[in-house]
Structure formats: C-alpha cells, structure tokens
C-alpha cells in the first residue's frame, strides 16, 4: 500500500501512441494524434469530501494525506504522471459531431492494482484542455457528487461501470446554465477522480476512421485487444473485437434494465469499448415504470435515450463502431453478420435476466410471451419499479381476487391501477411460478439477488447535494454506506415511492448535460 503522491504511475498509452506534446491548451483540431499532453489547472482550496476505501484498496492506495489531496484536486501531479487528454469524436443524439475529446477530463496515467491489473486514473473537472471547445474544463459539485456516488452504487448493484476514488471540492465558483435557458448562476466547483481499466470509447475509433488514419486505427485495435481482450486469437481479430464489444455492450444494457437505470445521453463518445457504464451525466433510475421516461431535458423532444429505447440505441451505436472499423476489415460482411446477430444475443441475455427477476427456475420457451405481457402490464399500470419487484418476492401462492391483488401492491402505485389487467397478469405469473422445479425459497432468493431494494433515486441525490453545498456531509456519508448493500434492508428508510414534491422539481425529475 502506498500514498498516491508516491505511487508509480505507468504511461503506457502516451508511450505507445503519437500525441501533441506542446502543452498548449488552445482549442483546436488535433489530426494525427490520439492525445494532447496537458496539466491540470490548480484550484484555490482543494478539500477532500469523499474517498472510496474500496477503490483505494483495489489500487493499493493508503488513505490520503495532504499531498495526495493536492493531486486529487488537480493542483499537482506526482513525478511519474504524464497527464493527457484523449482525442475522440462521436455521434450525439444521432448526428455526427466531429472531434470532441476530453474537454474536462485529464488522465494521469495507469496505476497497478492489487489484482495486478492496470487502472487508468482520470480527473474530471480539473481544467481546460485542447478539447474543451472554449469551455472552462471545470465541473460543479452537483454533477460531481452524482458521478462519484453513482459510479460506486452501480458497482455494488453488479452493473459494469467505471469507479470513483474521490470527490474534492475546489473552493472555486463555476458559472453554469443548468438548463441552457439563459439563467446562468455560480455553483461550487469540484473534481472527481474516476477509475477504469481504460476510458477508450467508440469515438476513439470514429475519429480515426473519419480522418482515414488506417494505420493508427489498426494500432489502437491491436493495443485494445492485447490489453483487454487477450482471448482474441488468430484471423479476423478486428471482427472478433467487434463481436466481443457487442456482447459486453449487450450485457451492460441488460443490467441497466434490470435495475431500472437510464443513462440519459448514450452518444457514441459515451460508449466504452469495454462495455462499462461511462460518463454519469443526466442519468436516473425510473420511479414509476415508464419505457418512455428520459431524465435528460435535451432529449425530451424525441426521447431518443428513453429507458425502453436503450437497447435499440446501443445497437445503433454499435453500427457506428462497425462503420469506423470497416476500413480495417477486408470482408465487411463479417461485421454486418455480427451486427445482425446482436439482437438475438441481446434478447437471450435480456429474457434470461427477466426470468431471474421473476424467480423462474429456468427460461422456458413460452416464458418470453409471459414476460412480454408482464412488461405490457407494467407500462400500463406504471407502478414504482423498485418497490413492485420487491413486493412480488412475497406474493402469496394464491394471490386472491382482483381487489386482493390491487391491495397487495397498493403501496407502489402512483396513480389508480387497472385492477383487471393487474389481476390477469399476476394470476398468469402465479400459475407459472407454481410449475417451478425449484422450491419457493430458491425462487425468492433468485429474485432477491436480481432486484435491488435500494437505488439512488434522483431526489435522494438532490437532497445530498443541497446539504453538501451548505457544508453538511452527513447524508453523503450515509449514502456511501447504503449503496454498498442495495439488496438488503439496510436503507429501508428509503423504501418508499418518490415523494410528490420531487415529481417536477429541477434536479430530481428534470436534468441536463450541464455539469
């Protein structure tokens, strides 16, 4: 175990690929390079607000001392760090956006963890880079706390995700227009240090394809395969890579749907080549079950990134990745074949997951129709998703009359439920459960493992932000503990529906990309 300021950091990425070493932060196009060397911009008063002991243990890091906090806030780097900002492009809301890059993220290099894996350390909110597009490269406490807590919460939920080591306040005010409506205001600034094996995105390949840089794209593919997909061997390595990324992406989206997570901004520059959840912005968990729910105000006109559309968007994004890799593949029909097979791969994973949520002993051929009808009922009745599945675990063997069933689930309804539809669906479900070859206890255990009892709803995060901005970190500390056991009853003070006051409140139901 070592302190961060003494930790040996390796610079595998910058030593492997061409970069712009000028240290010039002027916004510009950077053709022919994968990164620009940059330094974080110091802040006035970095103060540690939160520290993930679990992530620190994974990285082999001691509890932070003042020298470490200076690094976490972006005021200095240790002698082995060679910070950089990555160059990538992306499709945003379905449209090509050109060069984007790390506009407020600065990677410090790679840290060897206790598991002998290397983890990329990245500061978010540590100042401008050549990719900041004339912005300040900063982040506010509001968005930084959300990223810190949700990164860790998703890990404990069992969802593939980046992690977060620390949350540091900067002592500086940051000007932000939260809803892009002309009402800008100063907010307290903060920096998050986030952690992942790599932050390579679909967009890293898109920028190289757009610039027709075949050699560099092939080099990046080879690097990703060697480090993160060592099982890939033989011919068609790029096709194999695409297939592996597609499968991991399907896994990730299925896990999002399992816990009711809505990413909110699934642009291709926010899609990880490792299939982990990346870039926590205007995200949300669903409260009432609504496939059309999007937490992102920018997404409201078309609801492109709505809860129920995430699998389709992932497919579309994979199509953009296939296009970016096509000039490396002599027989592009092989990429097309992988993409065509994605829907079958996704559906198999999805229905298997749903069988676990519902406590089935196994996924049988006719279960898919039952699952589809079950979800149709949820879309109509719109119960609180988290609470509904928890109540379902304790459903009596004989659910009783339509009135009995409605009363059983009454605590999770936001509006008057369709009693007949609910009863018909629950009766069919109960009939199927009785055919399980496993015991009721085993079935219930499967359901408890698949259905979280506590999720970080936006109104809870909003309360934590408001308190922290006033100097009260008690709720933050409580939530840091609650998120570690989301399948237990430890956080049952929050086993309630979203309060009425939060239904239309900014920061609870309405969010934006402003951070």
Swiss-Prot record:
Keyword Nucleotidyltransferase annotated: yes
Reactions accelerated catalytically: L-seryl-[protein] + ATP = 3-O-(5'-adenylyl)-L-seryl-[protein] + diphosphate; L-threonyl-[protein] + ATP = 3-O-(5'-adenylyl)-L-threonyl-[protein] + diphosphate; L-tyrosyl-[protein] + ATP = O-(5'-adenylyl)-L-tyrosyl-[protein] + diphosphate; L-histidyl-[protein] + UTP = N(tele)-(5'-uridylyl)-L-histidyl-[protein] + diphosphate
Binding site for Mg(2+): 270, 279
Entry's Gene Ontology molecular function annotations: AMPylase activity; ATP binding; magnesium ion binding
UniProt-listed NCBIfam families: PRK00029.1 (NF000658)
Role according to the record: Nucleotidyltransferase involved in the post-translational modification of proteins. It can catalyze the addition of adenosine monophosphate (AMP) or uridine monophosphate (UMP) to a protein, resulting in modifications known as AMPylation and UMPylation.
Full protein name: Protein nucleotidyltransferase YdiU
